[in-house]
A protein has these predicted regions:
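Helix N-cap motif at beta-to-alpha junctions
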Residues: 13-15, 80-84
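Short, charged/polar surface micro-motifs in flexible loops or helix N-caps
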Residues: 50-54, 63-65, 83-85
């Protein structure tokens, strides 16, 4: 049987990215420097969320290279205990939802989409039943 372990995204500003994901309830677990030929190449920041054993790996490359999100990436979806509080925390960082939270169907959960500091689209789903 397979097990989902982690999702890795490349980041350009560790401070901004870490603050973004921490505002959504991710908990910092550890970091790991990648050194090749005596040179610091990358730093990986690992974050867990809730009871899940899978983690989010934020990778910062120290060589300054740039990245393209590509056309195949869609989004990461997160279920949150309190969407309103999470959006307020993100607003303090200057991050606004693409549009106001909405329901896909009557009686369904409230949801919205935001972009993290590197432009990755994140779906936020309120599981509080509000």
């Amino acid at each position: 049987m397979a097990e989902f372990l982690h999702t890795m995204v490349r980041i350009t500003d560790p401070g901004r990215s870490r603050a973004f994901y921490e505002a959504l309830g991710f908990e910092f677990e550890r970091d790991m420097d990648i050194v090749r030929n005596g040179e610091l190449e990358a730093t990986n920041y690992f974050y867990g969320i809730g009871d899940s054993r899978s983690v989010l790996e934020l990778t910062y490359n120290h060589d300054g290279r740039t990245y393209d999100l590509g056309s195949g990436y869609g989004h990461i979806a997160l279920a949150l205990d309190d969407l309103e509080a999470s959006l307020a925390a993100l607003k303090e960082q200057g991050i606004e939802p693409e549009r106001e939270p909405y329901r896909v169907r009557e009686g369904g959960s409230l949801l919205c989409f935001v972009r993290d500091p590197d432009g990755y689209r994140i779906e936020l789903i309120d599981r509080s039943g509000k």
